[in-house]
Amino acid sequence: MRQVHTTFPCGDILLEGVWHFPLVTEPSPAVIVCHPHPLYGGSMSSSTVLAICQTLARYSITAFRFNFRGVGKSGGEYGGGIDEQEDVKAALDLITLTSGIDRERIGLAGYSFGAGVGVPVAVRDERVSLLAMVSPALLDSGWQQLKECSKPKFMISGSHDFIIPPQQLEQYVRDTPELREFEVISGANHFWQGYEDEVADKVARFFANGFSLTEPG
């Protein structure tokens, strides 16, 4: 895996991000990974976000994580989850303009707040073909958008998540079309400490299957 730091524009501000390129010669699928809530310490340095990106690269998928506006070295300030949707669109623009990316196979993974911000973009943007949600923090409008979206989806939660309990998610799961899998990891909480590799592998397998890739040896 090759890791590359970069900056990219979103309107009149610059955002920082990190590529995780797999060691492949042909164009690879790509997944944007959106981090949890910045007002509660969330950033692209989240151990769960990092584990997902590293595992995606092991599955021959390019991963891209970035800091939302106002986080780390990204310009701007917190936008209440609305302006951050523009950050996701800017990351998609960057991916589609980057050589070595298979533009027909682009996915998005959102963790908590990252899912709440990423879902409204992913369900509408034709460039995104697969969507994974980790402990998703969605508003009712986000669940409604998911209900109307036919793209393949994956959702995962921890049995000890008391912020967004899996029982709360189950009421939405039944109404979400093309939800390929809803997993609940026993013992894990909202922050996934000690379970990062497990959740990362589940997410990466979903994208690998959706992109018709073989598992790493």
Predicted regions mapped to residue ranges:
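Catalytic histidine-centered segment of alpha/beta-hydrolase-like enzymes
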Residues: 76, 188-200
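Gly/Ala-rich beta-loop-alpha elbow adjacent to hydrolase catalytic centers
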Residues: 110-118
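Alpha/beta-hydrolase fold nucleophile elbow
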Residues: 100-111
